Regions:
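Short, conserved loop/helix-junction motifs that constitute active-site signature segments
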Residues: 96-101, 152-154, 182-186
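Conserved beta-strand signature within the Rossmann-like core of class I S-adenosyl-L-methionine
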Residues: 178-199
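A short SAM/SAH-binding and catalytic strip from SAM-dependent methyltransferases
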Residues: 152-173
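Glycine-rich phosphate-binding loop signature in dinucleotide/nucleotide-binding domains
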Residues: 75-78, 150-156
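S-adenosyl-L-methionine
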Residues: 121-154
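Rossmann-like AdoMet
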Residues: 1-83, 89-134
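Rossmann-like AdoMet/SAM-dependent catalytic core
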Residues: 201-277
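A short, conserved alpha-helix within the catalytic core of class I
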Residues: 131-133, 142-144, 168-183
Length: 277
């Protein structure tokens, strides 16, 4: 959310993400940091600093958010609900209440859900009636059971969002989650991001020595990846049809080039959009 908040300080024509809630949802120290980026030199220094963690990281994160936002906007007339897996401090559900009144299920670990509830109370005063916070651990709990306890129905045409999550899960959990989503109504949509499997196995580090050391060597935080050529067949196993797959080069052309900003992207992470058959 720091990225989305910082992007609000870019002029509208150069901004990659529009989200006026982003800064408000951050804890106080991060709000102070974001406030400092109203000064262009500080903002540019922060963006350049992100390159030390992972070259192209800033552009990748911003572009994936735009890709997901565009797909959700295109689908609003055709869906009955939204499910956000690994919601964290994501503001998408609250931006959505300005446009439509459909149920939005935000799923995350219990500790993150508790923090989200406090944050929403601080920013909005109360949780919107259309938003349901669902606490569970995808590694151990059943997703559909937890959703059903909060009013989810299998006849809903749902827009599922899984942004920046799959790499943190085991392959068993990713497959079990997709197996559960077999029950989604035809016409449901799924948008997700994934890192490439050759990064996970260490074959290609995509120039991100610091990131690889942090998520694969010092701590085993990332576990799962795919290769772009595998995605269609992988989804088809669970009744989903790949509609669009967007790599960094395509997303840069779509979102960054028109702004005139000189950002680089990494080939590490891709985005995919699918429909339930």
């Amino acid at each position: 959310m720091v990225l989305a908040a910082v992007e609000q300080n870019e002029p509208p024509g150069r901004r990659l993400v529009d989200d006026d809630f982003a800064e408000l949802f951050l804890p106080a120290p991060l709000r102070w940091l974001v406030g400092a980026t109203r000064f262009a030199p500080v903002r540019h220094l922060m963006i350049r600093g992100s390159e030390f963690t992972g070259p192209g990281l800033w552009a990748n994160l911003a572009c994936r958010k735009r890709f997901i936002a565009d797909k959700l906007k295109e689908s609003l007339d055709d869906i009955n609900a939204v499910v956000i897996l690994g919601a964290g401090l994501d503001t998408r559900a609250y931006l959505l209440t300005r446009r439509v009144r459909i149920p939005v299920f935000e799923v995350d670990l219990p500790v993150n859900v508790a923090r989200k509830f406090k944050t929403v109370r601080r920013v909005l005063g109360e949780l919107p009636l259309s938003v349901r916070l669902v606490a569970l651990d995808l590694e151990h709990d059943d997703l559909l059971t937890a959703l059903a306890e909060h009013g989810y129905r299998t006849d809903y045409r749902v827009f599922f969002i899984c942004e920046g999550v799959t790499q943190y899960l085991s392959e068993v959990t990713v497959r079990r989650t997709l197996d559960g989503l077999r029950a989604a109504a035809p016409g449901s949509r799924l948008v997700f991001t994934y890192v490439r499997s050759d990064f996970i196995d260490g074959t290609n580090r995509y120039g991100t020595r610091t990131l690889y050391r942090n998520v694969r060597q010092r701590r085993q935080l990332w576990h799962f990846g795919l290769q772009p050529g595998e995605v269609a067949d992988f989804l088809a196993e669970y009744g989903w049809r790949l509609v669009e797959q967007a790599g960094p080069d395509e997303l840069m052309q779509r979102y960054v080039v028109p702004t005139g900003r000189k950002l680089k992207a990494s080939q590490l992470e891709w985005s995919a959009y699918a429909e339930k058959t």
